[in-house]
Amino acid sequence: MHTTLKNIFSRAAQQPLNSRTPALSKRQRPLFAEQLEARRLLAADATVNLTGASQSLLGEDVNFVVTFDNTSTDPTDNIGYSPFVDIVMPLTGDAPPLPNNGISFPSGSTASYNGLNLSTTEVIFDANGEAIHPFAKDSAGQPVIVSGKPGDQLIVVELPFGSYGPTQPPIDIHFTGSISPDAQPNHAYDVTATGGYRYQVDAVGNPTDDNAAFGTTIVDPVQPQLFRLKKTSNTPEHETATGPNFQHSYTVSMAVAPGQTVYNLELTDTLPDEVQYISVVTISGNSSTTPIPQTSAPSTTSPGGTLSYAFDQVIGTGSDNDVQLVFDYYVAQQDANGQDVIPLGTGGTKTITNNSSATGLWTSSNPNFPTQQTVSSNASDPNSQYALTARTVALQKGFTNLTNPGSPKAGDEIRY
């Protein structure tokens, strides 16, 4: 159970998983332990999980999902009444000073469950970093004070259930966050979510007997990107046989944040020792001067090497085609060290991973960050890599619907 005694009557007393906890204010009074021990409380556990897109661009909207669940193992008093979720959006970001450059809950937007718009209340943290919860009460019947950063948003989402028990399945609540175009690339902006019950284990809602309950706060650190890479190949099912008879192509795509300009962009593809480079099919950059100079080229007779291009500038549209590099290759039978990629007579396999990266110069429109910055792609982004399996023999199986192509129905004739 994630809920603790101290966070039932004061949200300020609970600790997010990776945040510092502010001191209690005079209005945030924990209840004496003996009163809690006299009643069966905390049985209804409000557990949440928070996920969002990890590689979102400056100025983009991010789709978040909060998964709410009652994970109580108590066999009796385990029902929570009037469930809700508190979401804190880091609207201010790096401010003060202005402008705000974080992630906001867009004006006029709402949270939803299964396509149903939910009742959503927005409260702005005041100059003291306090927000009065719209309905949660403490043991004295007073509104719960939620602590946060002055100017950030508290978004309270009421779930469409009168009660919620541990036998009910987890539910997903969807909402959107808008990343400021003035945000700093690769800087973590924390979005948090906390589950709760307006009435702990009693539908009557007498505040002196049944005040609000809160679960553990979950943090999702969102790191906006100036640009993101996407690496693909036309190998069927991510596998190929070795040798020059089985040629394929890699495609390296880059999306640059809308309206942002990257200068002196260097795009690099590092070929593994098992991959033999053949030739470039196409190279392009939005608003780049052509021809785009090649700064490094792999050998066409020996596997491995580095393929690089230098773009004087790229103006972003947010499309994956802001930059595109396509080149042909095959998996050699022997690697750059003269060793068999797949030893003869073994009939084995080998996983081969190809990596791409990019570095460029960029100046923010945010007056608080006037200095030109060197920005690099996220090396841990799995989308900038492509893994394939080399085999001595690679087989694929497909089919064609001869009766209703594209609209399969029972009884159709299928050709494999």
Language-model features and meaning:
Residues A43-Y416:
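Exported/extracytosolic protein signature
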Residues M1-A44:
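Subset of Sec-pathway N-terminal targeting signals
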